[in-house]
């Protein structure tokens, strides 16, 4: 598949510069995290294109916002993480989509870990001072150490081979997960952060989770071998929402088919390139 107009270095440079200057960061952990990862992507684009000025500007903006999240100033109402010791969890302020009840932590915090990993690779000062805090955010959803302060692999069910998004698992249809792509990104971020911090145990945990999550996504969400879903009854190309009661073509926030499709592909990321290379035709699938 090729973009019919081809790659334009001039247009890409304009996009890099524009986003670096105007890109915003939401005030909650989901939209704030997405803004962080987008800025991390743009700074790598600028670096690869040799645009030193844009790269430095993007890196500085990303660094400032991540430091704000990883520190607390008495009296501030948002942009910080609070530890809930009774639950062994971190809650980012402001929470969203019920993240205060531990929903979707790997989705939300995976953005922070991914963006932090990129910045740690490019900024030694940030790596040394704030890398350990990024590690704590990663441990919230994927604690690879059997310790008392965090559950072991909070969001991952090793037996099922994939993550669950429900923090308490008390929905009427049991626990489940919509966005396979955000789950994969969360593991990729741990893998990258482990490499950046030279933390072998963390790196291996990221590889472990990434391997399980991608294989489960291929098996249960996309059913590549067509051996799990009865497509004579299920009239959709793949599963959008996998719960303990089966497959579903719905999301928690919309019934529009465009969201059922895109929630398995976004955010566009190098982390997904290898996995989704087998699904390029499906990526461009048009709902009819």
Positions of the model-derived regions?
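Ser/Thr/Asn(+Pro)-rich, low-complexity disordered segments
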Residues: 1-106, 134, 144-148, 152-159, ...
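Well-ordered alpha-helical segments within folded domains of soluble proteins
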Residues: 31-44, 105-120, 178-192
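Inter-helical turn/loop segments and adjacent helix faces that build the functional surface
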Residues: 46-50, 119-129, 190-204
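Generic detector of multi-pass transmembrane helix bundles and their immediately adjacent loops
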Residues: 104, 126-130, 138, 178-181, ...
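Active-site neighborhood of glycoside hydrolase catalytic domains
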Residues: 134-136, 180-213
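Interhelical loop regions of multi-pass alpha-helical membrane proteins
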Residues: 160-165
């Amino acid at each position: 598949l090729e973009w019919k107009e081809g790659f334009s270095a001039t247009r890409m440079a304009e996009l890099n510069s524009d986003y670096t200057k105007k890109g915003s960061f939401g005030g909650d952990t989901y939209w704030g995290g997405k803004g962080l990862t987008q800025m991390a992507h743009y700074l790598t684009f600028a670096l690869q294109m040799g645009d030193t000025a844009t790269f430095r500007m993007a890196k500085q903006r990303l660094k400032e916002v991540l430091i704000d999240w990883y520190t607390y100033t008495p009296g501030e109402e948002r942009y910080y993480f609070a530890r809930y010791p009774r639950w062994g969890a971190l809650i980012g302020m402001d929470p969203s989509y019920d993240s205060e009840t531990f929903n979707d932590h790997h989705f939300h915090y995976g953005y922070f870990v991914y963006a932090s990993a990129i910045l740690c690779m490019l900024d030694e000062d940030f790596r040394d001072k704030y890398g350990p805090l990024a590690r704590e955010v990663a441990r919230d959803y994927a604690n690879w150490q059997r310790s008392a302060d965090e559950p072991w692999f909070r969001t991952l069910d090793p037996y099922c081979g994939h993550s669950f998004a429900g923090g308490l698992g008390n929905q009427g249809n049991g626990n489940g997960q919509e966005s396979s792509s955000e789950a994969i990104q969360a593991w990729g971020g741990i893998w990258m952060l482990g490499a950046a911090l030279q933390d072998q145990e963390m790196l291996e945990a990221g590889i472990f989770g990434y391997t399980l999550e991608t294989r489960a996504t291929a098996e249960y969400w996309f059913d590549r071998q067509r051996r799990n879903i009865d497509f004579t009854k299920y009239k959709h190309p793949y599963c959008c929402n996998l719960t303990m009661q089966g497959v579903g073509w719905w999301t928690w926030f919309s019934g529009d088919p465009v969201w059922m499709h895109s929630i398995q592909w976004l955010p566009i990321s190098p982390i997904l390139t290898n996995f989704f290379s087998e699904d390029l035709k499906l990526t461009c699938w048009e709902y009819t």
